[in-house]
Amino acid sequence: LAIEAGMPPGVLNVVNGDKEAVDTLLESKDVQAISFVGSTPIAEYVYHTGTKNNKRVQALGGAKNHMVIMPDADVNKTTDAIIGSAFGSAGERCMAISVAVCVGKKTKEKIKTKLLEETAKLNVGPYTDEKSDFGPLNNKAHFEKVLGYIDTGEKEGAKLLSDGRNFKKQGYENGYFVGPTIFDDVKPE
């Protein structure tokens, strides 16, 4: 989209990676600016390390993105937006919508039904497969952390509508894949 809007190729790059990848970017003389959205401890690390290396840094910590869905929302467009945001880049993107708040029970039921129907069609697989809709998490520690979040949600009383913990991709059984996972009735605490 950035290129279609007229931005020269290579000016904007989105990178998912571990500490080694982040440090490489933060220390590279070729990188002039960094923008980060994520946990507060990592945002602080990115800010301090980036500014120490004379970079312009925007680091937003503790960020979560919410979508409020009104009763007159277009169900297809809304679920497409949620799915693209939540599952694109295996959910490891700064603009992932992690919380959808539906106004009214009818709205919730329509969105929930369509969301479950559409996520069941997603093709989870390696990024090298053009047919994949979303890929694996980028390392074992993060994979285990995500599985732990799902366990915690269940233990805290959220209703698990779609459970991706036991997802296995044929030929990639040791990959860090988590299938579509959707909770309902999550308590705000």
Question: Model segments located where?
Answer:
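PLP-dependent aminotransferase-like
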Residues: 1-22
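ALDH superfamily catalytic-core signature
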Residues: 29, 33, 40-188
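Beta-loop-alpha module in the N-terminal Rossmann-like domain of NAD(P)-dependent dehydrogenases
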Residues: 16-24, 38-45
